[in-house]
Amino acid sequence: MIGALVAGLVATGTPAEAAVAKPSASNTGVPAGKALTKYTGPLTITTAGTVIDGKAVYGDLRIQAKNVIIRNSYLHCGTNIPSGNSGCIDANSGTVYNLQVLNNTIIPDRPSYYRDGIVGHEYTARYNHISRTNDGLGIFNKPGGSVNANVTAEYNYIHDLTHWNHDPAHSDGTHNDGIQVQGGQNITIRYNNVVGSVVAGDGPGTYGTNAGSALIVNQNVARIANMVVDSNWFDRGQNSVCIQYRKYSNVTVTLQNNHFGRNQYNFGGGSKYPIRIYSKSKSSVSGLWTNRWEDNMS
């Protein structure tokens, strides 16, 4: 593991990219003043071109069609405990294509260790405010299908996920991550504000209010390719950015121009991991020297 070494690669100075407003509760989610009406349509979307706009949605949405748009809506999500890992918006179906998730507030009324924010492939997520879910965004191609994930995540605000000590998938409680990438090609993560923080679901965890990671890259589903992580704000977590090769011999990621806070979990003696790369020899991470501490931008 070379996390301690990588911590020294977060530089100081002013980045070259044009100024972008940092996503927050005030500039993401349902636009101020937008009137919402209760959504009464199907929760499983099978009609291409369906538009859900300005709705209060009670229930988890399953997308099984092309060119679906969900915008300007408050997703209260389901009231049940899902039978397996899913999301308030589930885009795991092989029939999903060009899903647009724009300017939504995604905060479940009943959080669950199986309920993420948006999960799957073939989607664009912009200006969403996501909180109290298990993971914020889950990204991977369809197992056994195309190698392409085709996901763009931009301008989202993700924070305060829900930690559970009881988690059927992990003996040590939920591994909450703001964004988890498990495989696939063509992934862009840009201009997001991802805070790796948690609130207690059934009690505090080992790491207090720190999640697993703000962003974790682990190839559990497929090899990752053409993945760019650019100009985001990352903070908190056991490590703010974690990169693992997992099931494949190596992992390749571009990680550039990102802004890091200094509030990661302290493992002792001031040992913190803004960026943690589990294997230097099995990882190709370009752009490391272009990442900055947020408090040293000027």
Placement of each model-derived feature along the sequence:
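Secretory targeting and sorting signals
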Residues: M1-A18
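Charge-rich, low-complexity terminal tails
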Residues: G13-A16, G138-P143, V151
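N-terminal segments that cap or nucleate solenoid repeat domains
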Residues: A19-H76
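Acidic, glycine- and Ser/Thr-rich low-complexity intrinsically disordered tracts
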Residues: A19-T37, Y248-S298
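Extracellular beta-strand/beta-solenoid scaffold signature
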Residues: T37-T40, V57-G59, C77-S93, P108-G117, ...
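Short, solvent-exposed coil/turn segments
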Residues: K38, I45, I63, L99, ...
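Hydrophobic aliphatic residue packing
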Residues: I45, L61-I63, I89, V101, ...
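Right-handed parallel beta-helix
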Residues: G49-A56, N67-C77, T95-D109, G120-N134, ...
